[in-house]
């Protein structure tokens, strides 16, 4: 499995896109800032493109970064919906 197949990585990148900050993302998700940057570097390496302009503060998404975050947000929404459907089924089966 490729590293970017991990939805946790998507969650990290989407959060960084919203906050523009690895530190705020780490605080929000309970991760060390260094691990947030490590995730970002791994995803960018596999995609072969930078997702953030690191020269600006707060960091800003590149065009490819905006595309990545848009699609990743949809995937995370679908994952949440899928889990909700199965949680409802479990509740009905137990009830």
Q: What positions do the PLM features span?
A:
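Short, solvent-exposed amphipathic helices
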Residues: 64-81, 89
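Helix-turn-helix DNA-binding elements, focusing on the entry/boundary residues of the two helices
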Residues: 21-22, 40, 54
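Residues within the DNA-recognition helix of helix-turn-helix
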Residues: 32-35, 39-42
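A short LG(V/I)-centered, amphipathic sequence patch enriched
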Residues: 44-61
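Short helix-boundary/capping micro-motifs
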Residues: 14-30
């Amino acid at each position: 499995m490729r590293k970017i197949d991990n939805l946790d990585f998507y969650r990290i990148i989407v959060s960084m896109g919203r906050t523009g900050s690895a530190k705020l993302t780490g605080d929000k998700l309970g991760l060390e800032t260094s691990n947030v940057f490590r995730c970002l570097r791994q995803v960018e390496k596999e995609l072969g493109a930078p997702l953030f302009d690191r020269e600006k503060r707060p960091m800003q998404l590149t065009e490819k970064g905006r595309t990545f975050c848009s699609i990743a947000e949809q995937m995370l929404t679908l994952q949440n919906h899928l889990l909700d459907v199965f949680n409802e089924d479990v509740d009905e089966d137990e009830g």
